[in-house]
UniProtKB/Swiss-Prot annotation:
<comment type="similarity">
    <text>Belongs to the mitochondrial carrier (TC 2.A.29) family.</text>
</comment>
<dbReference type="GO" id="GO:0021702">
    <property type="term" value="P:cerebellar Purkinje cell differentiation"/>
</dbReference>
<protein>
    <recommendedName>
        <fullName>Mitochondrial outer membrane protein SLC25A46</fullName>
    </recommendedName>
</protein>
<feature type="modified residue" description="Phosphoserine">
    <location>
        <position position="35"/>
    </location>
</feature>
<dbReference type="GO" id="GO:0042407">
    <property type="term" value="P:cristae formation"/>
</dbReference>
<dbReference type="GO" id="GO:0055091">
    <property type="term" value="P:phospholipid homeostasis"/>
</dbReference>
<dbReference type="Pfam" id="PF00153">
    <property type="entry name" value="Mito_carr"/>
</dbReference>
<dbReference type="InterPro" id="IPR018108">
    <property type="entry name" value="Mitochondrial_sb/sol_carrier"/>
</dbReference>
<keyword id="KW-1000">Mitochondrion outer membrane</keyword>
<dbReference type="GO" id="GO:0000266">
    <property type="term" value="P:mitochondrial fission"/>
</dbReference>
<feature type="modified residue" description="Phosphoserine">
    <location>
        <position position="32"/>
    </location>
</feature>
<keyword id="KW-0813">Transport</keyword>
<dbReference type="GO" id="GO:0007005">
    <property type="term" value="P:mitochondrion organization"/>
</dbReference>
<feature type="transmembrane region" description="Helical; Name=6">
    <location>
        <begin position="382"/>
        <end position="402"/>
    </location>
</feature>
<dbReference type="InterPro" id="IPR023395">
    <property type="entry name" value="Mt_carrier_dom_sf"/>
</dbReference>
<feature type="transmembrane region" description="Helical; Name=3">
    <location>
        <begin position="202"/>
        <end position="222"/>
    </location>
</feature>
<dbReference type="GO" id="GO:0000422">
    <property type="term" value="P:autophagy of mitochondrion"/>
</dbReference>
Length: 418
């Protein structure tokens, strides 16, 4: 139920004000919002698509009517490029290509995270909730084999089911966070100064957001694991309907083993908050390392304009990739427990991940999170928490490949334009 990437590329960072980064020896000026007469207090600036408009390190998109000062890599205005001397400045056509290519890089990353990776998410969730399975699919080879079987017996729709509901859950999560922060003093972002009170309020906002999105996440989970063989042609808003019905106790009848929503609050919020914290920390560390590495390379030798443009875009994407990978791997056992608790008692029929051409019912009787953990450990062993882990390997291998291909295409375009 968390977004596939943390909000913003500053992790727990603060976008406003002036930030001093010792790695670059100078302040980075954030975007200016203008005077209160130009923009109302209710207007907020949406986050930039990664790599779309940030032309240099630390530079954010300028607001309407406010000119932006050209940033420098060092404090001296006479030496915009490290090592002395002035590098070639891109012309208007080069700048347009720079913006267009950066926007394309961001869209390619978002497309990979939310569309191309969806079959891996479907298989991963089906393996996690299948307590009958004898094959755990810990490697990508067995996952590819079962993907082929599902596609052969049920068609391509078997691997793309529930994709619309995942976008709805992300929209509900972002919308709930914005509304709650608008009507409460809880901050959506925190400053770089470690203020325990501000961090606590920010995490409280995350907890409330995950609580609001929880019933819709549960409905989306059912759509992604329900077998296509017995699945009805549901509309794209079925996730919203089922989520509201879960809250008010209406909709599709469930069994007596269905866990009440209040018993799902703790594991759901715990998973969401831990995923956000781990992602933010990893992202911050990786981005800092890449910034220092880039800065040292600029000091050692003069770099080309093409390399400067690549250094402006890809560190954020790489940091986001590493953050998502680490958080998914670390929290995979907790995610398995969470999905089994959400799916219990919903009368869901899933595909047989051992054979690929049969269906199985979900008839678990967990009493809660602790009972679920103990039962998995006793009946399926420690590796039972990692069922379907091969899908994670395929998902992030595909993501890394798309990033590398995008970087190669972008480098070729820049070489032809310079």
């Amino acid at each position: 139920m968390h977004p596939r990437r943390p909000e913003g590329f500053d992790g727990l960072g603060y976008r406003g004000g002036v930030r001093d980064d010792p790695a670059f020896g100078g302040p980075f000026h954030a975007r200016s919002f203008g005077s209160g007469t130009e923009l109302g207090h209710w207007v907020t600036t949406p986050p930039d698509i990664p790599g779309s408009r940030n032309l240099h390190w630390g530079e954010k998109s300028p607001s309407y009517g406010v000119p932006s000062a050209p940033p420098t890599l060092e404090g001296s205005a006479e030496e915009p490029f490290p090592g002395g001397g002035e590098g070639p400045r891109p012309g208007p056509s080069s700048e347009q290509l720079n913006r267009f290519a950066g926007f394309g890089i961001g869209l390619a990353s978002l497309f990979t995270e939310n569309v191309l990776a969806h079959p891996c998410i479907v298989l991963r969730r089906q393996c996690q909730v299948n307590y009958h399975a004898r094959h755990y699919h810990l490697t990508p080879f067995s996952i590819i084999n079962i993907m082929y079987s599902f596609n052969k017996t049920q068609g391509p729709r078997a691997l793309w089911k529930g994709m619309g509901s995942t976008f709805i859950v992300q929209g509900v999560t972002l919308g709930a966070e914005g509304i709650i922060s608008e009507f409460t003093p809880l901050p959506r972002e925190v400053s770089h100064k470690l203020n325990p009170k501000q961090i606590g309020e920010h995490l409280l906002l995350k907890c409330l957001t995950y609580m609001v999105a929880m019933p819709f996440y549960s409905a989306s989970l059912i759509e992604t694991v329900q077998s296509e063989i017995i699945r009805d042609n549901t509309g794209i808003l079925e996730c919203v309907k089922e989520g509201i019905g879960r809250v008010i106790g209406l909709g599709v009848p469930h069994s007596k083993r269905l866990l009440p929503l209040f018993s799902l609050i703790f594991p759901t919020v715990l998973h969401g908050v831990l995923h956000y914290i781990i992602s933010s920390i990893i992202q911050k560390i990786v981005l800092l390392i890449l910034k220092r590495k880039t800065y040292n390379s600029h000091l050692a030798e003069s770099t080309s304009p093409m390399q400067n443009m690549l250094d402006a875009y890809f560190p954020e994407l790489i940091a986001n990739f590493a953050a998502s990978l680490c958080s998914d791997v670390i929290l995979y056992p907790l995610e398995t427990v969470l999905h089994r608790l959400h799916i219990q008692g919903t009368r869901t029929i899933i595909d047989n991940t051992d054979l690929g051409y049969e269906v199985l019912p979900i008839n678990t009787q967990y009493e809660g999170m602790r009972d679920c953990i103990n039962t998995i450990k006793q009946e399926e062993g420690v590796f039972g928490f990692y069922k379907g882990f091969g899908a994670v390997i395929i998902q992030y291998t595909l993501h890394a490949t798309i990033l590398q291909i995008t970087k190669m295409i972008y480098s070729t375009l820049l070489q032809n334009s310079i």
